[in-house]
Design a protein with these regions (language model features):
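Short N-terminal edge-element motif at the start of the domain
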Residues: 1-29, 33
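Intrinsic-disorder-associated interaction segments
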Residues: 1-4, 8, 12, 75, ...
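Charge-rich, solvent-exposed alpha-helical interaction surfaces
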Residues: 10, 14, 18, 85, ...
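Short glycine-rich, low-complexity/disordered patches
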Residues: 20-39, 99-153
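N-terminal interaction modules that seed assembly of large macromolecular complexes
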Residues: 25-62
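Alpha-helix initiation/capping motif
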Residues: 45-53, 70, 165-170
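Polybasic, proline/glycine-rich intrinsically disordered low-complexity segments
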Residues: 53-119
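Glycine-rich, aromatic-bearing surface loops/beta-hairpins
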Residues: 132-181
Length: 181
């Protein structure tokens, strides 16, 4: 049985540790995102800095929103340490349950996998909300997001972003989501 509460707690600890480690080196981190693989076998943290954003683009450029919000273009990525341990646990569970999670004839995910995926996503979202509470005093302007490649649609991403960030930032994110997603 997958321990979703342990998974959530470990994510919070990993995100906090990663953010504090990065903050020692970078004083202009503006967005931290939890990245989860579509097959639920790994997680990592990504972040971008104002300096990196300004090196890639400026607010007048057509591609500014792409560089501001597209995780794949960001400067910082962490999949080691606690994230690696969490990913190992995720991968082991997926491998042990492969016969239940994948239809052997179609190679498509099963309903059972979809249920597991929903619980994983819920745990990730709770972890990010908890992170918001725990780091708000030290990082009041830090934006947070959640990314699963080719899984969450624009509306779902914008809705979650709005649930953990300011109204102003959320409106900007939603207005430009087609430029980076």
């Amino acid at each position: 049985m997958f321990d979703y509460k342990k998974f959530e707690n470990d994510l919070v600890a990993a995100m906090e540790a990663t953010l504090h480690k990065w903050a020692e080196e970078y004083d202009d981190i503006y967005l931290l995102s939890l990245d989860c693989a579509r097959d639920m076998t790994s997680v990592g943290m990504m972040a971008n800095t104002e300096q990196h954003l300004n090196e890639e683009s400026d607010a007048e450029d057509d591609d500014y929103w792409f560089y501001k919000y597209c995780e794949e273009e960001w400067e910082l990525f962490e999949a080691g340490g606690l994230a690696k341990e969490i990913s190992s646990y995720m991968r082991q569970y997926a491998e042990e349950n492969d016969a239940r999670f994948t239809d052997p004839e179609t190679f498509e995910f099963t309903e059972e996998f979809d249920e597991h995926c929903d619980q994983m996503i819920d745990a990730c979202e709770r972890a990010i909300r908890r992170l918001r509470q725990s780091v708000h005093q030290d990082f009041p302007k830090l934006l947070l997001s959640f990314h699963i490649r080719e899984y969450l649609d624009d509306e779902e991403r914008a809705e979650f972003f709005a649930s953990v960030n300011s109204k102003e930032a959320s409106e900007e994110y939603a207005a430009h989501i087609e430029d980076f997603n």
